[in-house]
Amino acid sequence: MQFTALLAALGAPLALAASIPAAAHNHSMIDVQLAATGNSMIKATITNTGDRTLNLLKFNTIMDEHPTRKVMVYQDGAEVQFTGMLPRYKMSDLTPEYFVNLGPKASVEHSFDLAATHDLSRGGKIVVKAHGMVPTAEENATTITGHTLYESNELTMDVDGKQAAAVEQAMGGDDSTGVIDKRSNIVTSSCRGSQLRVLQTALSNASRLSRAAASAAQRNPSKMREYFKTADSRTVQKVASRFLSVARESSSGSTGRTTYYCNDNRGGCHPGVLAYTLPSKNQVFNCPSYYQLPALNNRCHGQDQATTTLHELTHNPAVVTPFCEDLGYGYQRVSALPASKAIQNADTYSLFANGM
């Protein structure tokens, strides 16, 4: 995967990001066009449609360089299984390499192979589209101050299944084996030093926070409207049920449905990643930076081990169905999501639990 910077009008190089008021970030300031460049290859062209420079954070967007969920893929009206990773990124201490500077009317291209993160072995016609929210920072800065939305064109492709099946899966490989702990199926042989104790504490705290959040969802309609944008009975029931499912998984005695690793063995712990999930396998992996987080954060909406574990468990279809995605990060982005997306956003659940 690679970024290819395109020249802006008059051939000027990409400028540094300009200051953009956060209030102006609720609409789309970028255009995303998808094009097929091979059997399962996609080229995404991202264009700044405005008259000011944008500083775009790549995490969990169409520009993410890692095997994350960049697009939705459908075949015969059903979603094609995603086999890539769903990471939780550390949102503090961001550095410039996590951003793309995009001048007015300038574009960048990002290419990726769908077959590396989707099972396309069946072959045939597929439909691909992308949508999301890109966090933005101000000029010469790395503090997130706003966001912009995007929605791509709908692309139809005819895939050769045999050719797609020959593409190496980005997060593939045989399932690891090891000694399993009874709680949430922790692979204890993956833990070093105090990591097992830290993870067990995080799971215990995640269970406690999830039960409290389930109760708050049922008793505090104003908080439901703040985070999930509605307090109707159906949404309340669904949110509470999901929190209780996370609580059960976090405290399971011997029936855990996820497999949790203290350390990464699939190469997904890229810079900035706290932990990640493989939803196709119901597996969660902690990264070294996870152990630098506090067990619990007293700062409202601050990241910690407990809510990171809670966040990752919502990515697992064995716990939450359909599993939650990464549609918005941080309180400002979460609070901008409509109800239909808030309920499917992993960070909405972790922030709600942290804020109770």
Curated annotation (Swiss-Prot):
It comes from the Eukaryota. This is Probable neutral protease 2 homolog ARB_04769. The keyword Aminoacyl-tRNA synthetase does not apply. It comes from Arthroderma benhamiae (strain ATCC MYA-4681 / CBS 112371) (Trichophyton mentagrophytes). The lineage of its organism: Eukaryota, Fungi, Dikarya, Ascomycota, Pezizomycotina. GO terms for cellular component: extracellular region. PROSITE patterns: ZINC_PROTEASE. InterPro entries: Fungal_M35_metalloproteases, MetalloPept_cat_dom_sf, Peptidase_M35. Its EC number is 3.4.24.39. Disulfide bonds join 191-262, 269-287.
